[in-house]
Amino acid sequence: MSGTFLGFDFGTKSIGVAVGQRITATARPLPALKAQDGKPDWNVIEKLLKEWQPEAVIVGLPLNMDGTEQPLTARARNFANKIHGRFGVAILLHDERLSTVEARAGLFEHGGYRALNKGSVDSASAVVILESYFEQSF
């Protein structure tokens, strides 16, 4: 087992990406992927999987604050299932409530408004999702 994990913050226009290590329980952002109505370029995802060879992929599960599902929840779950179906990699879904809020706060703290572009926020959210998964699981 490599101890490497990829994290995805699913969105219909942009999908945040992060890579992390279980041993350090830390993650770092990778460039966000463009998506057309939630559909990524699967060749790019394949390249990420080949490059990082993750033990598992963590996909953020968007839930309402009360824990109920929202319309995007099913689409994120479908995205996760497609990754598993196409590439056979282990998939874990992880609650992503407040990940975008935390990501925006961290980016703003380090770079002000200029740091708050869509791709940066999405990949920073993927970092938050992955590190939250590590904290709860290991």
Curated annotation (Swiss-Prot):
Q: What is its main location?
A: cytoplasm
Q: Does the keyword Transcription regulation apply?
A: no
Q: Name one GO cellular component term.
A: cytosol
* SMART domains linked: YqgFc (SM00732)
Keyword Hydrolase recorded: yes
Residues passing through the membrane, by range: none
Any one GO biological process: rRNA 5'-end processing
Specify the domain of life of the species encoding this protein.
Bacteria
* Keywords, comma-separated and alphabetical: Cytoplasm, Hydrolase, Nuclease, Ribosome biogenesis
Where is this chain's protein located in or outside the cell?
Cytoplasm
Q: What InterPro entries does this protein map onto?
A: RNaseH-like_sf, YqgF, YqgF/RNaseH-like_dom, YqgF/RNaseH-like_dom_sf
Q: What molecular function terms (GO) are annotated for this protein?
A: nuclease activity
UniProt xrefs under Pfam families: RuvX
What is the main EC category here? hydrolase
Which EC number applies?
3.1.-.-
Q: Briefly, what is this protein's role?
A: Could be a nuclease involved in processing of the 5'-end of pre-16S rRNA.
The record, for PANTHER family, names: POLYNUCLEOTIDYL TRANSFERASE, RIBONUCLEASE H-LIKE SUPERFAMILY PROTEIN
Similarity-based family: Belongs to the YqgF nuclease family.
- Fetch the NCBIfam families from UniProt: RNAse_H_YqgF
| Name used for this protein in its record | Putative pre-16S rRNA nuclease
- What is the organism field in this record? Klebsiella pneumoniae subsp. pneumoniae (strain ATCC 700721 / MGH 78578)
